[in-house]
Amino acid sequence: MKKLSILVTLLVFAGLLAAQQPVLSIEKTTHDFGKIKEQNGVASVTFTLTNKGNAPLVINRVHASCGCTTPTWTKEPILPGKSGTVTAAYNPQNRPGSFVKTISVFTNAGTNATVLTIKGDVIPKPAVSN
């Protein structure tokens, strides 16, 4: 009987631990810069990530689809009910025309990456005439 009550207690405790999960919520996953001028330099946007779970959310890594986009992100764990950020900085230098770039966010909230998208249209610098 004593062994059975210990086993039941351990199973209940294990179930409670398994229920402790971070839940990632992002209100907006796409940002359209619209028309940006190449001569204005880097264009940035910050995405807000909220932890709607009951365990800390950790951003393990963030990967941009090309070298023209530099991501930065919250490095410390995001506590339940709190928010963190991922900022994407797009460098339009020598990249006139339309663009669509992705930023993959890997967290402890699941095995799949959450994909953020930035897009816009780069207006080239005016040509220098002699």
Regions found by a protein language model. Give the residues of each.
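Beta-sheet-dominated interaction scaffolds and their linkers
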Residues: 20-49, 125-130
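Short, hydrophobic beta-strand segments
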Residues: 86-94
